[in-house]
């Protein structure tokens, strides 16, 4: 996917990129490659693939959800900034918080935000399990995003405690999501969530399937969740 296709295919989905946004994506790619030489941020390095598999894919929730309103977003395990930084570039009014357990990734993201001129962005070096127990963050976000971080049963425990009641947890998955979802239904329910939509689409050009799961927070998460670091993965809610 070249930059012209990126621009055109987003236009077809109702997302118009300003010249500033296009320049920010260009700089994002440059910084990603520069920093990737000193730390492992992405295995995908050729420009067309980064634009398709990272930038375009990260914006896919906006094909189904209205990000034009004033929203607070928390991205759990953002890695090199996906999906939240592309969303912030396209929708600069979003109030963004990023949580990642690796300090060097946070350092990259802080540098990236400064270079791109992003405002109203906060970065937290923390485990999702401990972050979700802090009163100032627990059940405080309109949207929580996660992209292929863990299985749904695990991911729900890391993310749903951060979503405010009536807010939305957006889980971005590859094609194998159905089985994962079946195994994760109990956890979603226990943690106060309810599946509101499952959207499947083909990533253009390479025609690989993607699934986006939208989970609405319908009631408060019980105080015992999230459990201590490592427990959601070792003993998922079943």
Swiss-Prot record:
One of its GO terms (cellular component) is cytosol. S-adenosyl-L-methionine binds at residues 77, 82, 128-129, 147. GO terms for molecular function: rRNA (guanine-N7-)-methyltransferase activity. SUPFAM superfamilies: S-adenosyl-L-methionine-dependent methyltransferases (SSF53335). It is found in: Cytoplasm. Gene3D superfamilies: Vaccinia Virus protein VP39. Disulfide bonds: none annotated. Its main location: cytoplasm. Its EC number is 2.1.1.-. Keywords: Cytoplasm, Methyltransferase, rRNA processing, S-adenosyl-L-methionine, Transferase. Coiled coil: none annotated. PANTHER family: S-ADENOSYL-L-METHIONINE-DEPENDENT METHYLTRANSFERASES SUPERFAMILY PROTEIN. Belongs to the methyltransferase superfamily. RNA methyltransferase RsmG family. Specifically methylates the N7 position of guanine in position 535 of 16S rRNA. This is Ribosomal RNA small subunit methyltransferase G. It comes from Geobacillus sp. (strain WCH70). The lineage of its organism: Bacteria, Bacillati, Bacillota, Bacilli, Bacillales.
């Amino acid at each position: 996917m070249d930059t012209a296709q990126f621009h055109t295919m987003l236009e077809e989905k109702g997302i118009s990129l300003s010249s500033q946004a296009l320049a920010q994506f260009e700089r994002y790619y440059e910084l990603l490659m520069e920093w990737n030489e000193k730390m492992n941020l992405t295995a995908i390095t050729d420009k067309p693939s980064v634009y398709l598999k990272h930038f375009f894919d990260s914006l896919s929730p906006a094909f189904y959800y209205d990000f034009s309103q004033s929203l607070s977003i928390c991205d759990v395990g953002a890695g090199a900034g996906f999906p939240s930084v592309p969303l912030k570039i396209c929708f600069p009014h979003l109030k963004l918080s990023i949580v990642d357990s690796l300090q060097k990734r946070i350092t990259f993201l802080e540098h990236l935000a400064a270079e791109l001129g992003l405002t109203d962005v906060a970065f937290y070096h923390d485990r999702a399990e401990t972050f979700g127990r802090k009163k100032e963050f627990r059940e405080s976000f309109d949207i929580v995003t996660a992209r292929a971080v863990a299985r749904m049963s695990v991911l729900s425990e890391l993310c749903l405690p951060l979503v405010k009641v009536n807010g939305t947890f957006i889980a971005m998955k590859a094609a194998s999501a159905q089985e994962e979802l079946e195994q994760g239904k109990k956890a979603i329910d226990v943690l106060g969530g309810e599946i509101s939509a499952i959207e499947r689409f083909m990533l253009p050009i390479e025609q690989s399937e993607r699934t986006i799961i939208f989970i609405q927070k319908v009631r408060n998460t019980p105080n015992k969740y999230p459990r201590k670091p490592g427990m959601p993965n070792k003993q998922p809610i079943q």
